[in-house]
């Protein structure tokens, strides 16, 4: 049995998007589950729209997500490469001309105005969907030769009549499309660049791709691609078309929707846990047989069955992704966090207490950095208008009177809180909020005694002076 090979083939016209990351992830999981190979190749023929760091964004951010390719432009295998379409232009052109020689394709000499005229004629006839008619263009043989000599033509593949293109979709089951709904279509544009549906087939054949998981927008591309496989007498891969990802209102994710971060680098920069996103994206259109949510990298690979891919759209719930990231960060050893954030200069006991206290409630490292900043800048921030009412001031004064700065510890601070509670017969928010505001200058936070202790006796004593 031949090795299972999957691929992710982005265009470097933009950065790695949530949808692209999920597509790459599912192809990666399918390959790894069956001990196959996962390939990244770059479809960079849309030169005008390519951006300088588009390719790097795709590969580097996938690597950050722990989605590493067996082969890519950075790890080429000569047997299957090149891994950028821009390096294969001559090959696409050569195969297109071979199809002409075999009678499967032809040169189409229409210019843009003539093609537009044919479309308008089709509309007048009431044709719902335009299909190119190869005998519509009426030009002289002399004009045809002139255009041929100057390369003013595209190459179209001949769409066979009354043919059904059928495949057993890995996600959706049986799908069939009648060729009469397609028409002849362009495989090489007038600038000698290949169209997507032509180049992608050549690439998949060259790289011996056996399974393809991709977005549902590619369903209409599949019969065109199957046509090329047939003309080249090449075995077809198995196709699977994933459902869309929507926002919480059920609308398809749009890159123009600025209310939601949609690019992986944005979550990386904010300090989300990469394995948490890997875990979260896996469940965005796939369910575990045992209904587990939190699974590590190897567990997910072992459990991944494509038969459990969803046929229904998946909602991108940012709150759920934050929950995943929170679970991963709070279970991350302190030593690892110290290394990631370069916190070696801090006192070991202090930084471990800080991390134990705050990592429980963060979903991003930026949050942790902001909490750390509160302590780092404490000396610069000794005064604050707290706007306490008389009852709250009384709580702070009582607490202040019980603190022993010569014996400053978490236990001693907790004892001062307890004595204040007993003296004033209060509890909950009425007890904790005034003390937290007066000592930490925050209204919310983790366990109060520990949060106060981390400031150190000197800073707390200065902040308590006004309450004596």
UniProtKB/Swiss-Prot annotation:
Q: Which UniProt keywords apply?
A: Aminoacyl-tRNA synthetase, ATP-binding, Cytoplasm, Ligase, Nucleotide-binding, Protein biosynthesis
Q: Subcellular location, in the record's words? A: Cytoplasm
Report if keyword Lyase is assigned: no
User: What chemistry does it catalyse, as a reaction equation?
Assistant: tRNA(Glu) + L-glutamate + ATP = L-glutamyl-tRNA(Glu) + AMP + diphosphate
Job description of the protein: Catalyzes the attachment of glutamate to tRNA(Glu) in a two-step reaction: glutamate is first activated by ATP to form Glu-AMP and then transferred to the acceptor end of tRNA(Glu).
Q: Indicate what this protein is called per its UniProt record.
A: Glutamate--tRNA ligase
Q: What family does the Swiss-Prot or TrEMBL record give for this protein?
A: Belongs to the class-I aminoacyl-tRNA synthetase family. Glutamate--tRNA ligase type 1 subfamily.
One GO molecular function term?
zinc ion binding
Q: Where does motif 'HIGH' region map?
A: 10-20
Q: Which Pfam families match?
A: Anticodon_2 (PF19269), tRNA-synt_1c (PF00749)
HAMAP family per UniProt: Glu_tRNA_synth_type1
Can you name the source organism?
Mycoplasmopsis pulmonis (strain UAB CTIP) (Mycoplasma pulmonis)
Enzyme nomenclature, EC number:
6.1.1.17
GO annotation, cellular component aspect: cytosol
The record ties this protein, via PANTHER family, to: GLUTAMATE--TRNA LIGASE (PTHR43311), GLUTAMATE--TRNA LIGASE, MITOCHONDRIAL-RELATED (PTHR43311:SF2)
- What biological-process GO terms show up in the record? glutamyl-tRNA aminoacylation
- Keyword Ligase among record annotations: yes
Motif 'KMSKS' region, chain ranges:
252-256
Q: Which residues bind ATP?
A: 255
- Tell me the domain of life: Bacteria
UniProt subunit comment: Monomer.
Checking InterPro entries in the record gives: aa-tRNA-synth_I_cd-bd (IPR045462), aa-tRNA-synth_I_codon-bd_sub2 (IPR020751), aa-tRNA-synth_I_CS (IPR001412), aa_tRNA-synth_I_cd-bd_sf (IPR008925), Glu-tRNA-ligase_bac/mito (IPR004527), Glu/Gln-tRNA-synth (IPR000924), Glu/Gln-tRNA-synth_Ib_cat-dom (IPR020058), GluQ/Sye (IPR049940)
């Amino acid at each position: 049995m031949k090795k299972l090979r999957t691929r992710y083939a982005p265009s470097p016209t933009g950065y790695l998007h949530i949808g692209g990351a999920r597509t790459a992830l599912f192809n990666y999981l399918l390959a790894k589950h069956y001990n196959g190979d996962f390939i990244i190749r770059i479809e960079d023929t849309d030169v005008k729209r390519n951006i300088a760091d588009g390719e790097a964004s795709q590969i580097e951010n996938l690597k950050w997500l722990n989605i590493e390719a067996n082969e890519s432009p950075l790890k080429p295998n000569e047997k299957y490469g090149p891994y950028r379409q821009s390096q294969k232009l001559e090959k696409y052109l050569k195969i297109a001309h071979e199809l002409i020689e075999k009678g499967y394709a032809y040169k189409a000499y229409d210019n843009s105005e003539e093609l537009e005229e044919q479309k308008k004629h089709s509309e007048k006839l009431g044709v719902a969907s335009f299909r190119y008619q190869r005998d519509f263009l009426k030009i002289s043989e002399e004009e045809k030769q002139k255009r041929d000599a100057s390369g003013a033509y595209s190459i179209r593949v001949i769409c066979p009549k009354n043919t059904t293109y059928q495949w057993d979709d890995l996600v959706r089951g049986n799908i069939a499309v009648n060729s009469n709904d397609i028409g002849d279509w362009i495989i090489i544009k007038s600038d000698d660049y290949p169209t997507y549906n032509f180049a992608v087939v050549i690439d998949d054949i060259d790289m011996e791709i056996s399974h393809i998981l991709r977005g549902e927008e590619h369903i209409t591309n599949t019969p065109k691609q199957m046509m090329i496989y047939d003309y080249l007498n090449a075995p077809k891969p198995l196709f699977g078309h994933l459902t869309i990802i929507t926002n919480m209102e059920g609308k398809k994710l749009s890159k123009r929707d600025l209310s939601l971060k949609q690019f992986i680098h944005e979550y990386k920069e904010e300090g989300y846990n990469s394995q948490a996103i890997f875990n979260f994206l896996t469940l965005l259109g796939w369910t575990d047989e045992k209904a587990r949510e939190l699974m590590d990298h190897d567990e997910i690979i072992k459990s991944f069955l494509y038969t459990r891919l969803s046929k229904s759209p998946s909602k991108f719930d940012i709150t759920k992704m934050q929950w995943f990231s929170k679970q991963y960060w709070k279970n991350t050893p302190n030593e690892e966090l110290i290394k990631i954030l370069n916190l070696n200069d801090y006192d070991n006991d202090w930084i471990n207490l800080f991390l134990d206290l705050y990592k429980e409630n963060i979903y991003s490292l930026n949050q942790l950095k902001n909490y750390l900043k509160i302590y780092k800048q404490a000396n610069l921030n000794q005064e604050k208008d707290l706007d306490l009412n008389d009852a709250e001031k009384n709580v702070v004064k009582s607490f202040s009177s019980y603190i022993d700065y010569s014996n400053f510890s978490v236990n001693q601070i907790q004892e001062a809180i307890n004595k204040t509670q007993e003296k004033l017969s209060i509890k909950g928010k009425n007890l904790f909020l005034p003390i937290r505001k007066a000592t930490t200058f925050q209204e919310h936070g983790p366990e109060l005694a520990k949060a106060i202790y981390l400031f150190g006796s000197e800073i707390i004593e200065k902040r308590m002076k006004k309450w004596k």
